[in-house]
Every structure is written in structure tokens, then in C-alpha cells.
């Protein structure tokens, strides 16, 4: 399998990107990685490590797309950027997947304009896996489509179901519709119409899920439009971040608290691991004709390694073919 990596995407590029690539090929000799970016910078980073040099190659890219640029215009104009060249490798059939920790909007625009959507899919959905109290869960869409039609949400649910079954090994994953109340009649026109379609879809739909219940992980796939999903995602991240800050402040407030924390260290370590985004790799853009994964902007080498493994799993489990086939059956 050949994977294209945006070598300059993210806060820690290219150091974390290169290290993650090296760690990934050491764990899986069957993959080949193409890193796009300034060849001098990428080469300098690669020289720090010992690895099978035939497993990683560089495609020179002098430019970078930043988060401050208009996504569509940047993709169209910056054809010498690391992100454009990584996407183009998939478009031209020279790579099977693309991973970037750079601009989410530009990656989304590039995936849509350059790679395209699976036939029958109306919108590509950003679909991160989040840590839950009982088990991880997916939010789809988490920001790619601010405005949605009811049928889009049914497609998001189907794609999430296929990902959970194929990549995570969960049989008959549960699907919930994010809403302001659990009752069927709650919500706006979008959620009311989507509820009816999901109920009739044949998917394992369990009804509405209120945001306060989202983090339990009792429902595997939370379906919503991108505005709601992105708000939910950022609120969740913010609460987790501030919770850890509050906990740290309390632990360091007294000697007694420090002693207690020392005794609880293994428990606290496991708790922190649950909320470590690097454990989950990246967020797949479900519905794209190619495997497209958005890594977190502050991804470290572990996150990149896991995102690469995630791409491999998507390819080996043929999720694109499954989405195409099951969409036809649903319709």
C-alpha cells in the first residue's frame, strides 16, 4: 500500500510527521510512504533515523497551505504546496491514501475537487472517533457540511456503520441522531425529517441522543450536521482540556494532594490515555473516492503512526467498496 503524507501539515511538521512515518514502516514493512514537502527539510529529518530507505520517498513541494487561507482558492492556486501534491498523488493513482494535519478546509476542498466522491454520496463527512465513558464513539459530520439535507444524515450514518464494522470490528453498531431531546417529535425540520428516514433505513437506529449523553459511548455513531457536530466536538475537547487543568491545579495545591495523586498515578495515567487524541490516529473523510484522513493539528509522531495504521486498515477492509455497494442496497 502506498500512502501520501503532507509533510508540512500541522503544528509539529516536519519533525513529528517524519518520525511517525519511520515508526509506521518499522511496524509494517508492506507499506510505502511518500512524504511531500521541501526535500531539504524532509531529508534532514530522515537522516536522524535508521530505516529501510526504500520504504520512504520524497516528492519536493516548496509551498504550504496555511489555516488562514481560503480553502478552495488555496487548493486551486497553490499547486506547489505539500498538501496539493499529496492529494494529487491519490488523484493520479500513485498513492492509495492521503494523510494531513494541515488545514481541514483545504483538505476537504482538495478531497472533493481532486479525488471526488463515491458515486451516490452527496457529501463527504468528517468523522472523528472520540473517547467515551464506556467505549469510543464517532461524530459524523463534525464540520465538513454546515448545512445538510435529511438524506445526507442517512448517508453519514451508513458510512459510519461501515467504518465501525470494518475498521473497529463492532457488529451492528448503534446509531443515534444528536438532538435537543430524546422524544421523536423534538428538534427542527432537519432532525425531524432525518429521524423518519433513519427509522425507515434498516440501520440500527436507536433514536435521538441528547448532547449530555453523547460522551457515554453507549451509542456508537452520533449523526448530525457539520455545524452541530463541530460545536459538539470543540465543546467536548474544551471540557476535557479544562478538566485536566483543574485536576492538575488541585493535585499541586498541597503536599497531601501530591501524595494522594502519587498513589493514584496508574489510574490517572489510564484516564489520561483515554483522552489522548494520538491513540485514535485521525478523522476519516468518509465518502471520498480515496482514503483521506485528517490528523489533529497538534499531532505528535504517535498520532501520525496511528493515522497511517488507520489508513492501512481502511484499505485492507475495503471500506470504499463497501460504502458504494451498501449505498446501492440502501437506495
Curated annotation (Swiss-Prot):
Domain of life: Bacteria
Major subcellular location class: cytoplasm
Catalytic reactions on record: a fatty acyl-[ACP] + phosphate = an acyl phosphate + holo-[ACP]
GO BP terms: fatty acid biosynthetic process; phospholipid biosynthetic process
The keyword Transferase is assigned to this record: yes
GO cellular component: cytoplasm
Pathway entry: Lipid metabolism; phospholipid metabolism
Family indicated by similarity: Belongs to the PlsX family.
Subunit structure: Homodimer. Probably interacts with PlsY.
Protein name: Phosphate acyltransferase
Source species of the chain: Clostridium acetobutylicum (strain ATCC 824 / DSM 792 / JCM 1419 / IAM 19013 / LMG 5710 / NBRC 13948 / NRRL B-527 / VKM B-1787 / 2291 / W)
